[in-house]
Amino acid sequence: MNRSKFESVFSEEINQYLDHMLVSGYKERSYYYLLRKFDRFCIEYEICQPIFTHQHAKEWIHRKENEASTTHYARVNGIKQFLIYLNRKGYQIFV
């Protein structure tokens, strides 16, 4: 799969996480789209430092209008795993 370029402050970490998941046997496609949404979210909310605050988390977990509960669950929990990954690497991340 050809990856589009991620553009947020977390772009390098997103690519490393995708590589890690591929090596672990997961399919890139299942994570790519969620991480792309997260990348856009970070740009939209002008996250310029590699820090994810409580306020950012509140905005991310807010259920979108017309978002199915299963889609909401997948979006929130898929990115939660990425945030845990960042937290373990020493980033200031609210999980």
Where are these regions (language model features)?
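Intrinsic, low-complexity N-terminal interaction/targeting segments
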Residues: M1-F6, C48-F52
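Intrinsic-disorder-associated interaction segments
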Residues: R3, E7, H72-R75
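Extended non-catalytic domains of envelope/secretory-pathway proteins
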Residues: F10-E12
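N-terminal core-binding DNA-recognition domain of tyrosine recombinases/integrases
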Residues: I14-R29, Y33-V95
